[in-house]
Amino acid sequence: MKMWFRLATFVTLIIEFAHCQLGAGLTSALTGNTGNAAHAGNSGNMATSMAMAAAMGSDFAALGPLGAKLFSGAGMSPAVAYKMFDGSVADFQKYKAKMNLMKRLNAGGSGGIAGGGGGGATGGLGALAMGKLALFTGGGMDPVVAYKMFDGSVSDFQKYKMKKKLAAAAGAGGGMGIGTLAMMDGSMADMAKFNMLSKVLSPPTGSQTGAAANGTSAGAAVRGGSSPLRRIANMRMTRKLCEDTPVVYRMRRCSPQLPCRHALTTCKQTLRYGSVCCAKNLYAAAMFENMPGF
């Protein structure tokens, strides 16, 4: 009985929170009356989210179309945005932290929206609203994924600054994939992880570059491009593809004719179910994936 009473109380609190904080705009979105599903047109999303922005208070409304686009203009419905809040007492603090973060990112005006570049941080949020993060050069990112990176904690702005530094380290044409961004959790260990991974995935030598044409192990190191960040992302993505798939698929994908293409090397060690990646690479990947926060 106590459990049901607590559950009913919790649900009531969530409903009251939604009603008070987000207003009628969100309530109608949650009940489906606005037609604002995840795949609804941007114009419908925009209208509803602007109403939601006004209901959420002057902080959010002051951001205008940019603030609304962060939630729905590029594919995020108000209902989905609301689900990011769990109904806890900390929700209002999360809301304030996110508003402050958006204000900092938007400090340079509208230049970032138009060009995806702007000045400094502006390009990051401007491009976010348009469907990509200019902050992370070349590594197109879904707005929902980008928004979820920030959890409303005090460390959000530190995460932003660290990721900006890492993106700069990758170089203008380096690119940063979603796989790489997922590695970064905002902890103090992030820079150490980056430095260590960069050493392991050091730029290929002349001999390695030449070997690429022959499809040798050394030559495969250059498949991911010259950027350490891109190679890190490729390492994780390829490992996932080749090692975490069902055996039937793995046999086709990683046969002796189509060896498992790891970002570090190409292996031709044939086992019972086909080809697998070299032990050296498996060790390297496991070493980093087992690090705290990785």
Curated annotation (Swiss-Prot):
- Region annotated Disordered, chain positions: 205-225
**Distribution of this protein across tissues and organs:** Nacreous layer of shell (at protein level). Expressed primarily in the mantle with highest level in the mantle pallium and lower level in the mantle edge.
Cite the record's Low complexity compositional bias ranges. 205-221
Where would one find the signal peptide in this protein?
1-20
Asked if Transport is a keyword of the record, the answer is: no
Q: What is the top-level taxon of the source organism?
A: Eukaryota
Compartments (UniProt record): Secreted
Give the UniProt keywords, A-Z. Secreted, Signal
Keyword Secreted among UniProt keywords? yes
What GO terms fall under cellular component here?
extracellular region
Protein name (database record): Glycine-rich protein 2
Protein species of origin: Pinctada maxima (Silver-lipped pearl oyster)
